[in-house]
Amino acid sequence: MTRTSSPPCRGGVPAQPAGWCALAIVVMLAGCAVGPDYNRPDAEVAPAYKEAGEWKLAQPRDDLDRGKWWQVFGDPRLNALVEQVEISNQNVLAAEARFRRARALVAGSRAAFFPTLDADVSVTRSRSPAGAIGGTTAGRVITNRSASLSSGWEADLWGRLRRAVESSEASAQAGAADLAAARLSAQGELASNYFQLRALDAQKQLLEDNVAAFRRSLDLTKNRYDAGVAAKVDVVQAETQLKSTLAQAIDTGVQRAQLEHAIAILVGTPPASFSIAPATLASAMPQIPPALPSELLERRPDIAAAERRVAAANAEIGVAKAAYFPSFTLAATGGFRSAEASQWFTAPSRFWSIGPALAQSIFDAGLRRAQTEQAIADYDATVAGYRQAVLAGFQEVEDNLAARTASS
């Protein structure tokens, strides 16, 4: 029911008992929210790591600051390269843009809680047919002037808006975890490539020293052969040894160039304009403390992102189910309307309207049911993805623990 008025108001509208009752009902219903409340899905977790030794299980702590972990290696060149990843790595920049988009979606979903306010000003000229029946404007050209403000607000009776905010917030948290995962992945890949490159530097230097030694040995063997104190087979053997070592040195150089190119891409630089001078490692590799808990798994941002996507999908079920219930809105409009410019913004030209509206879809050919089933299927898929991420995380921890145990 909408109440309207064209003449000027001369007093307040008396409160009606029915109106207060309706307002109380709206307030009470605003505390409801359809759809399932979120609970983190169970994931199969072993009571202990197979390769754990002194390691232990721990709780997720992906929100902890990892700090500049690469600085423990004490390599200034590595430090500079990793710092550049944050600025120039394209995968990190893309993840950061997606996170900003997710935060904007949160702001957009929260805006639905508040009323809207729109302004409209128009001046139109119109002419009615000369033969029109009734009215005094037949055949005349009329100029209508209007200036108004309109406002609308939707009462979140069934929690549709709240579930939408829950979904967008969880998606933004997943975006933050994705950004952390992109940073960690790029930093880890760069560090791994860098240490492989430095290992190849040492290997290449050793091979070059061997090539020089084998070349001297070949010259000596040839001289001995010319003097008749060495057999031809000794010369052939020395030549084969030199050629084999030369081939290894060339292959090592190719591998080093490929790693250098990979590092260039990670820091967002064209390979043609990027190079790393050969050098030895700045320090020995740090040792992992034997009593360190399994933080490798508990702080993984990819698992946190998968879990947050489950929460977002769960909230979308509530959004879909809220469509089964009617929507309740309040709308109000007021302003000035006149055919005479001199009377436009005067009291007799004022108008207003205010009232609630209730809307309910009666028939949609199964659309709402299909949307609900889609939301449930999306939730089931994210649960499976979360559990798979947990399993993959445990596999990687077990693999690294096994490698650490074998090398100790």
Predicted segments, located by residue:
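Terminal intrinsically disordered/low-complexity segments used for targeting and assembly
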Residues: 2, 23, 28-87, 145, ...
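Small/polar, glycine/serine/threonine/aspartate-rich low-complexity segments that form flexible
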Residues: 57-73, 122-150, 273-289, 318, ...
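Amphipathic alpha-helical coiled-coil scaffold segments and their short linker/junction regions
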Residues: 58-63, 71, 86, 167, ...
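Membrane-embedded beta-strand positions in outer-membrane beta-barrel channels/transporters
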Residues: 82, 146-150, 194, 239, ...
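Sec/SRP-type N-terminal targeting helices
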Residues: 93-94, 110-111, 155-183, 233, ...
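Periplasmic alpha-helical coiled-coil/stalk elements that build and connect Gram-negative outer-membrane
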Residues: 161, 177-292, 403, 407
